[in-house]
């Protein structure tokens, strides 16, 4: 009979951050006796989950995708935002093969370069600095017609905050002497992701036909008129900005188009309108024969067009490494975070590794999770305890969604109830691990529920930039190093399992043997 395995578990408490202050801190103020016990009696430190520590620009809050990628990879995974910003700073962006080639083709045709994208400092789907850098590159490579088609934000930025971005862009293009902001439209239309093709068509027809319900002399005038109509940035209707003629800046045969969003999900639909011959979302009245259409990053493996920043492959994540060592592993979460403990934790790979099993627990069917703050945590725990006691798994990775998903609701009392539910679940898990001689690390991918009200007294619904806890439960006599990062967790797990880390993992183990 095969000997039962003593599991090492990683428990990821999504959105469970640390903050000194107790005001509006749903975690600190909740009744969590087990958490209080392990926080004071077990090895316990704080680790970093935002900014450069996870491959994001300094000061940028972390998120679940980035967090799980770093947790599983065992190295800092530089995000597209950071890769592109770094290339611009280092002068490498100007030589990017896809971007420079597209611009050169348009210039040799005597045609225009069109830059599409979310013109915003939000940093979630795009950054206006990238768009401005592309304007400069186009001019340096000889383009004398550079048109920015500005999609307006208002979701990752305040609802009416687009004016400085439009002014900054028009000012630069005027200085370069090569173009203007040629159209504006809210992201509600240009960046749909739910196959609402009527919205996307409004953007496509604006770009390719110059069809728009509104025209204006300048981008700022267009925005002012939209505000007067009661439209916030996100919902600004298609507006064409006049030049030498109404249609001098529509996308035409021989032009180059560069889509400057780095996040894929809301860039796919509009991209498909331009590049798919068998597109069937709506009837295209014009399909320009472009010199090139460039995606800033790969929006989908199924979209076949030039890409400036292809995905970098992550090899030897902890999941892949476990498989090469013929170890067994389990990934478990409820629906809301299932992709995070599977696809993202595996370095962007969907397929199961050899020896890997997965358990998906459905998330509750409620409008918002403050209505059921425990979500499916008790059911996740039932399956997790069963897996621990089964003796089947060397490594178990589990996500609890409550701190993040209930935190996003902005409802303080519900977030406290979520924390109290997690506390009860952790006690059950610790008892099961103790019973079989197992061990675990408890941490989070980023904070959220530790701050439920912002400095203006409004509900605080987004992630935080503060640290998160790291706690060890198990039989080993160890301490934990301070100042760790998410990328140090995989090496720490391997250390606890008495396994060497692969050379690809540049994170450091935080385990100190006493």
Swiss-Prot record:
<comment type="subunit">
    <text>Monomer.</text>
</comment>
<keyword id="KW-0464">Manganese</keyword>
<dbReference type="GO" id="GO:0004619">
    <property type="term" value="F:phosphoglycerate mutase activity"/>
</dbReference>
<dbReference type="InterPro" id="IPR005995">
    <property type="entry name" value="Pgm_bpd_ind"/>
</dbReference>
<feature type="binding site">
    <location>
        <position position="337"/>
    </location>
    <ligand>
        <name>substrate</name>
    </ligand>
</feature>
<keyword id="KW-0324">Glycolysis</keyword>
<protein>
    <recommendedName>
        <fullName>2,3-bisphosphoglycerate-independent phosphoglycerate mutase</fullName>
        <ecNumber>5.4.2.12</ecNumber>
    </recommendedName>
</protein>
<dbReference type="InterPro" id="IPR017850">
    <property type="entry name" value="Alkaline_phosphatase_core_sf"/>
</dbReference>
<comment type="similarity">
    <text>Belongs to the BPG-independent phosphoglycerate mutase family.</text>
</comment>
<feature type="binding site">
    <location>
        <position position="463"/>
    </location>
    <ligand>
        <name>Mn(2+) 1</name>
    </ligand>
</feature>
<feature type="binding site">
    <location>
        <position position="14"/>
    </location>
    <ligand>
        <name>Mn(2+) 2</name>
    </ligand>
</feature>
<dbReference type="GO" id="GO:0006096">
    <property type="term" value="P:glycolytic process"/>
</dbReference>
<feature type="binding site">
    <location>
        <position position="445"/>
    </location>
    <ligand>
        <name>Mn(2+) 2</name>
    </ligand>
</feature>
<comment type="pathway">
    <text>Carbohydrate degradation; glycolysis; pyruvate from D-glyceraldehyde 3-phosphate: step 3/5.</text>
</comment>
<dbReference type="GO" id="GO:0006007">
    <property type="term" value="P:glucose catabolic process"/>
</dbReference>
<feature type="binding site">
    <location>
        <position position="125"/>
    </location>
    <ligand>
        <name>substrate</name>
    </ligand>
</feature>
<dbReference type="GO" id="GO:0005829">
    <property type="term" value="C:cytosol"/>
</dbReference>
<dbReference type="Pfam" id="PF01676">
    <property type="entry name" value="Metalloenzyme"/>
</dbReference>
<feature type="binding site">
    <location>
        <position position="408"/>
    </location>
    <ligand>
        <name>Mn(2+) 1</name>
    </ligand>
</feature>
<dbReference type="InterPro" id="IPR011258">
    <property type="entry name" value="BPG-indep_PGM_N"/>
</dbReference>
<feature type="binding site">
    <location>
        <begin position="263"/>
        <end position="266"/>
    </location>
    <ligand>
        <name>substrate</name>
    </ligand>
</feature>
<comment type="function">
    <text>Catalyzes the interconversion of 2-phosphoglycerate and 3-phosphoglycerate.</text>
</comment>
<keyword id="KW-0479">Metal-binding</keyword>
<feature type="binding site">
    <location>
        <position position="404"/>
    </location>
    <ligand>
        <name>Mn(2+) 1</name>
    </ligand>
</feature>
<feature type="binding site">
    <location>
        <position position="446"/>
    </location>
    <ligand>
        <name>Mn(2+) 2</name>
    </ligand>
</feature>
<dbReference type="Pfam" id="PF06415">
    <property type="entry name" value="iPGM_N"/>
</dbReference>
<feature type="binding site">
    <location>
        <position position="64"/>
    </location>
    <ligand>
        <name>Mn(2+) 2</name>
    </ligand>
</feature>
<dbReference type="InterPro" id="IPR006124">
    <property type="entry name" value="Metalloenzyme"/>
</dbReference>
<feature type="binding site">
    <location>
        <begin position="155"/>
        <end position="156"/>
    </location>
    <ligand>
        <name>substrate</name>
    </ligand>
</feature>
<dbReference type="InterPro" id="IPR036646">
    <property type="entry name" value="PGAM_B_sf"/>
</dbReference>
<keyword id="KW-0413">Isomerase</keyword>
<feature type="binding site">
    <location>
        <position position="193"/>
    </location>
    <ligand>
        <name>substrate</name>
    </ligand>
</feature>
<feature type="active site" description="Phosphoserine intermediate">
    <location>
        <position position="64"/>
    </location>
</feature>
<dbReference type="GO" id="GO:0030145">
    <property type="term" value="F:manganese ion binding"/>
</dbReference>
<feature type="binding site">
    <location>
        <position position="187"/>
    </location>
    <ligand>
        <name>substrate</name>
    </ligand>
</feature>
């Amino acid at each position: 009979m095969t000997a039962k395995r003593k599991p090492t578990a990683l428990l990821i408490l999504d959105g469970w951050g640390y903050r000194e202050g107790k005001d509006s801190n749903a975690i600190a103020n909740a009744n969590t006796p087990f958490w209080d016990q392990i926080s004071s009696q077990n090895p316990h430190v704080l680790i970093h989950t935002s900014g450069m520590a996870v491959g994001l620009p300094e000061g940028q809050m972390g998120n679940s995708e980035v967090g799980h990628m770093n947790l599983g990879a065992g190295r800092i995974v530089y995000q597209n935002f950071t890769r592109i910003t770094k290339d611009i700073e280092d002068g490498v962006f100007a030589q990017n093969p896809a971007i420079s080639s597209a611009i050169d083709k348009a210039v040799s045709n005597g045609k225009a370069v069109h830059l599409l994208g979310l013109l915003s400092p939000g940093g979630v789907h795009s950054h206006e600095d990238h768009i401005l850098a592309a304007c400069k590159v186009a001019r340096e490579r000889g383009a004398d017609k550079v048109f920015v088609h500005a999609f307006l934000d208002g979701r990752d930025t305040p609802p009416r905050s687009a004016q400085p971005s439009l002014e900054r862009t028009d000012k630069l293009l005027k200085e370069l002497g090569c173009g203007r902001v040629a159209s504006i439209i809210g992201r509600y239309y240009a960046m749909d992701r739910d196959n609402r093709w009527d919205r996307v068509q409004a953007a496509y027809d604006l770009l390719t036909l110059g069809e728009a319900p509104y025209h204006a002399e300048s981008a700022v005038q267009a925005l002012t008129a939209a505000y007067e109509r009661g439209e916030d940035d996100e919902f600004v209707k298609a507006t064409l900005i006049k030049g030498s003629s109404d249609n001098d800046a529509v996308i035409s045969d021989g032009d180059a188009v560069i889509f400057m969003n780095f996040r894929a999900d809301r860039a796919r639909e509009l991209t498909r309108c331009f590049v798919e011959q068998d597109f069937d979302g709506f009837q295209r009245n014009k399909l320009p024969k472009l010199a090139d259409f460039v995606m800033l990053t790969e929006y989908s493996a199924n979209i076949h067009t030039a890409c400036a920043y292809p995905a970098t492959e992550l090899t030897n994540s902890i999941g892949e490494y476990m498989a090469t060592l013929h170890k067994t592993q389990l990934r478990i979460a409820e629906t809301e975070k299932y992709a995070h403990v599977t696809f993202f934790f595996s370095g962007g790979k969907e397929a199961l590794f050899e020896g890997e099993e997965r358990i998906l627990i459905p998330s509750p069917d409620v409008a918002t999770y403050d209505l059921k703050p425990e979500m499916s945590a008790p059911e996740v725990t039932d399956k997790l305890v069963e897996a621990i006691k089964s003796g089947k798994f060397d490594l178990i990775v589990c996500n609890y969604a409550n701190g993040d998903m209930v935190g996003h609701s902005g409802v303080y009392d519900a977030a406290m109830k979520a924390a109290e539910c997690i506390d009860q679940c952790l006690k059950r898990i610790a008892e099961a691990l103790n019973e079989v001689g197992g061990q675990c690390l408890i941490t989070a991918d980023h904070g959220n529920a530790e701050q439920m009200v912002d400095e203006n007294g409004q509900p605080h619904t987004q992630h935080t930039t503060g640290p998160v806890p790291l706690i060890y439960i198990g039989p080993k006599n160890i301490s934990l190093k301070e100042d760790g990062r998410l990328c140090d967790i995989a090496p720490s797990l391997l250390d606890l399992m008495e396994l060497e880390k692969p050379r690809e993992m540049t994170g450091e183990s935080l385990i100190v043997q006493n």
